[in-house]
């Protein structure tokens, strides 16, 4: 369900007319219209409305003794007695930004201390409106020039680094493998997060804040909502799914959100049979519960709990064997956060428990992987003054992974009849770290930030110290520069190919520029990073060092009221080092274009056209073979010239259409999408015949169609 609810917030409520109709507009102090502000009557909140793109609203009024309430996140709630205004005249409501005292800010503040140093900050609306997201919080990142994800998955890869160097954090707790429908290599089609629970999502493309550990590339920080504007029930169905989502208020501003989804494949594969020649079956069943409770004015508690049962059946070719690949996975995790607000600070205690069991089989390869994670942290943010904030903390991250495998004796002999051997491996890691981080608003133009994070070695670990420095310069209210650099460490996540925790290191420096003016946004960046450590690509190649230099450009323009145009491009120069020899990196691109054109008219429909283009990835081909009489298979030998071949250029055009219908308290949303309109065969993997004399290619997603509807009730 969560992949397709993106159109729910694309349109506004159509006013319901009655004998007394109050019309008006909601603006901020600068005269800008406020979109999606809540407008309702105090004694009849279920008949409230949401302002449209121009900040306008219409509300039926039957009792002039009632009170009009107008609210929006980040602004003071406005209350207007109806008897004090002429109902028949157009009403102008001006919202003022929150201007609490320091103590009040401490009680209500939710932004992280490093917020001003994030490259991008997204909220729920940004995710839904994002033309590349498909309603997925992590896929929303792919529209950014900093995103270098090339496998059409939700696994975030930032500025040329591998996904295993980037971390996703939910309410201060790291979530490893934050994707579903994942393969043996960790690639996942969609994330496990529902956008309806998200308050804000911060993207640190480089130099992740050292308030968090175990990341050496980038960081995605997700915060769940802390206030529920209204009760809501959603029912959805589509070509491959059915789902329900319920948001319910409880007393004292507490609330609960419950959602469940079921995915099925028969109809989807049947309609897209020509494009789904390898996919035989898939299923997903998940259940999530998010609870937020306020215990007095100073104490709050949030608990997010999630369960998923998923699997797939797909035809796979590897080396000279072709057969079915089967996967099943069950996962359950909980993330809990307790916050206590003192007079001059915020104490946060966080805990996460994550357990999963995954089974995978292909030919003579069988793998059962059981993982356990327990994370605990305590942080205190101290507001020393209005301009200086210090945060310190300690964290412990315990990870355990057991692999019960049947492994091919010969990597190239994968048929069920080929010899294999049993392996039972258990690895664990304890990451105990302490940190300190400060943010100093030097004046109205300069902001300085710095942090240090060190491990406390256990179990014969090596000592390491991470450090960073950031300097932000605000030229004016529209433009800013951010210069940041640092040294970072993280442990790799064990997988089928390498069953160990490997310490990785990264040195980074980046310069980011941002310009915002009315309906125009422009960002640019230049960065350099050197990543060291025995990073595993597959069972054949281990990268010792990877150096990446990149340049990025992003442009967004809204025009003619209903149109929005987005264009981004990236340049990457990447070099990898293997056994002291240098080669071209897999993601060495002279362009990486992402562009979209969106038309959203709440009275008619929403139409979005997206286009992605980049050079093909580099790969290492098989150059020599020897026939092995013992296995009756040819043994391939890869070229010594790593990444000497390249897949064809990647090009993809998608189109999506949606329509919103309003019926009093309910709404109906219908949607459809056509992906890869031109049915372009974008090469994803090179395949060979039995003696490796001929090659052919597996492709990314071909042309597919998808459609469905969502019914929504506000009460």
Per-range role (PLM):
Residues 350-352, 503-549, 554-565:
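Membrane-embedded beta-barrel scaffold of Gram-negative outer-membrane proteins
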Residues 45-56:
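Short, acidic Ser/Thr/Gly-rich low-complexity loop/linker segments typical of extracellular
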Residues 89, 112-166, 172-208, 219:
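Periplasmic N-terminal accessory/gating domains of Gram-negative outer-membrane beta-barrel systems
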């Amino acid at each position: 369900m969560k992949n397709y609810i993106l159109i729910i917030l694309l349109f506004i409520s159509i006013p319901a007319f009655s004998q007394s109709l109050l019309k008006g507009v909601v603006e901020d102090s600068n005269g800008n219209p406020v979109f999606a502000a809540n407008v309702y009557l105090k004694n009849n909140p279920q008949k409230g409305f949401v302002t449209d793109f121009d900040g306008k609203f219409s509300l039926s009024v039957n009792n002039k003794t009632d009170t009009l309430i107008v609210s929006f996140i980040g602004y003071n709630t406005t209350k207007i007695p109806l008897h004090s205004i002429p109902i028949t005249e157009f009403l102008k409501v001006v919202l003022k930004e929150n201007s609490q005292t320091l103590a009040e800010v401490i009680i209500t503040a939710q932004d992280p201390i490093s917020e001003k140093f994030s490259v991008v900050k997204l909220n729920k609306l940004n995710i839904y409106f994002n033309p590349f997201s498909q309603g997925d919080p992590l896929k929303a990142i792919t529209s950014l020039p900093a995103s270098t994800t090339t496998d059409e998955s939700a696994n975030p890869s930032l500025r040329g680094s591998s996904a295993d160097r980037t971390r996703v954090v939910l309410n201060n707790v790291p979530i490893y493998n934050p994707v579903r429908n994942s393969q043996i290599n960790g690639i996942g089609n969609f994330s496990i997060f529902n956008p309806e629970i998200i308050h804000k999502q911060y993207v640190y493309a480089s130099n992740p804040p050292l308030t968090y550990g175990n990341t050496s590339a980038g960081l995605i920080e997700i915060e769940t909502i802390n206030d529920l504007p209204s009760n809501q029930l959603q029912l959805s169905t589509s070509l491959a799914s059915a789902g329900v989502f319920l948001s319910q208020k409880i007393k004292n501003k507490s609330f609960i959100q419950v959602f469940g989804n079921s995915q099925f494949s028969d109809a989807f594969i049947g309609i897209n049979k020509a494009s789904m020649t390898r996919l035989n079956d898939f299923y997903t069943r998940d259940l999530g519960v998010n609870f937020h409770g306020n215990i007095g004015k100073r104490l709050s508690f949030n608990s997010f709990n999630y369960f998923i049962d998923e699997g797939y059946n797909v035809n796979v070719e590897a080396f000279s064997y072709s057969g079915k690949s089967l996967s099943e996975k069950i996962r359950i995790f909980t993330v809990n956060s307790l916050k206590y607000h003192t007079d001059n600070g915020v104490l946060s205690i966080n805990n996460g428990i994550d357990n999963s069991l995954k089974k995978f089989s292909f030919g003579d390869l069988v793998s059962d992987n059981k993982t356990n994670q327990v994370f605990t942290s305590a942080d205190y943010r101290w507001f020393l003054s209005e301009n200086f904030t210090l945060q310190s903390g300690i964290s412990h991250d315990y990870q355990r992974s057991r692999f019960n495998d049947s492994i091919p004796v010969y990597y190239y002999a994968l048929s069920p009849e080929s010899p294999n051997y049993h392996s039972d491996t258990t690895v664990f890691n304890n990451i105990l770290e302490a940190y300190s981080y400060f943010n100093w608003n030097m004046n109205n133009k300069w902001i300085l930030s710095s942090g240090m994070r060190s491990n406390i070695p256990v179990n014969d670990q090596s000592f390491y110290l991470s450090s960073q420095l950031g300097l932000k310069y605000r030229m004016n209210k529209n433009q800013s520069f951010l210069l940041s650099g640092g040294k970072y460490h993280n442990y790799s996540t064990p997988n089928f190919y390498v069953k160990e925790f490997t310490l990785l290191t990264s040195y980074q420096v980046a310069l980011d520029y941002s310009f915002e003016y009315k309906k125009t946004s422009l960002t640019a960046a230049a960065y350099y990073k050197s990543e060291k450590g025995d990073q595993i690509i597959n069972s054949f190649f281990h990268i010792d060092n990877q150096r990446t230099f990149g340049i990025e450009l992003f442009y967004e323009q809204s025009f003619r009221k209903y149109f929005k145009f987005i264009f981004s491009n990236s340049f990457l120069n990447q070099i990898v080092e293997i056994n002291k020899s240098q080669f071209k990196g897999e993601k060495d691109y002279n362009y990486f274009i992402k562009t979209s054109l969106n038309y959203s008219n709440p009275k008619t429909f929403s139409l979005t056209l997206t286009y992605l283009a980049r050079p093909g990835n580099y790969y290492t081909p098989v150059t020599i073979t020897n026939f092995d009489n013992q296995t009756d298979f040819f043994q391939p030998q890869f070229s010594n010239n790593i990444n000497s071949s390249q897949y064809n250029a990647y090009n993809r055009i998608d189109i999506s259409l949606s329509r919103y219908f309003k019926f009093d308290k309910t709404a109906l949303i219908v949607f459809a999408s056509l992906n890869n309109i031109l049915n372009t065969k974008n090469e994803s993997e090179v395949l060979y015949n039995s003696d490796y004399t001929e090659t052919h290619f597996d492709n990314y997603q071909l042309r597919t169609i998808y459609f469905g509807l969502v019914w929504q009730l506000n009460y």
